[in-house]
UniProtKB/Swiss-Prot annotation:
It catalyses: (8S)-3',8-cyclo-7,8-dihydroguanosine 5'-triphosphate = cyclic pyranopterin phosphate + diphosphate. One of its GO terms (molecular function) is cyclic pyranopterin monophosphate synthase activity. Pfam families: MoaC. The gene is moaC. This is Cyclic pyranopterin monophosphate synthase. The active site is at D126. Its EC number is 4.6.1.17. It comes from Herpetosiphon aurantiacus (strain ATCC 23779 / DSM 785 / 114-95). Homohexamer; trimer of dimers. One of its GO terms (biological process) is Mo-molybdopterin cofactor biosynthetic process.
């Protein structure tokens, strides 16, 4: 059943008023594949537009906070934290963005995590396109989520993190 449709098939915002307030967390990932020389410039901080990685982190955080303004039917959520990690993977010639979003609320933060990772990737593309127009944004997905009535989720493409 699609929760965003009423009994007549019309879109509506899901009523979460009766759901329990719980700790929620979601992680999302986006990869930006690029030429090896572009990755070297990014990691060294030598692109003409400045510190691309710091700008991408800030853009991702801002995007998570604006998710309800951009995705129809998303609830505005009081986010507790948004973290953006950007890892260089030279062997695959890509940057991997992992966003982690937390809140205490009645609905999950998967969309906020996806927005954060996606907009961070778009920012990297925007700031590096002058040197590499062939970059590809790929593998955008929810890695995991915790909290809520439907329980935890771990995407099969990501290893289980047991460090916490």
């Amino acid at each position: 059943m699609l929760t965003h449709l009423d009994d007549q098939g019309r879109a509506h915002m899901v009523d979460v008023g009766d759901k329990a307030v719980t700790q929620r967390q979601a992680q999302a990932q986006a990869d930006v594949r690029m030429q090896p020389a572009t990755l070297d410039l990014l990691v060294a901080g030598e692109l003409p537009k400045g510190d691309v990685l710091a700008t991408a982190r800030i853009a991702g955080i801002m995007a998570a906070k604006r998710t309800a303004d951009l995705i129809p039917l998303c609830h505005p959520l009081p986010l507790s934290s948004v973290a953006i990690e950007i890892e260089a993977h030279p062997a695959q010639s890509l940057l991997r963005i992992i966003s982690t979003v937390r809140c205490t609320g009645r609905t999950g933060v998967e969309m906020e995590a996806l927005m954060a990772a996606s907009v961070a990737a778009l920012t990297i593309y925007d700031m590096a396109k002058a040197v590499d127009r062939a970059m590809v944004i790929e593998q955008v997905f929810v890695r995991n989520k915790t909290g809520g009535a439907r329980g935890d989720f771990q995407h099969p493409l990501t290893p289980l993190d047991t460090s916490e």
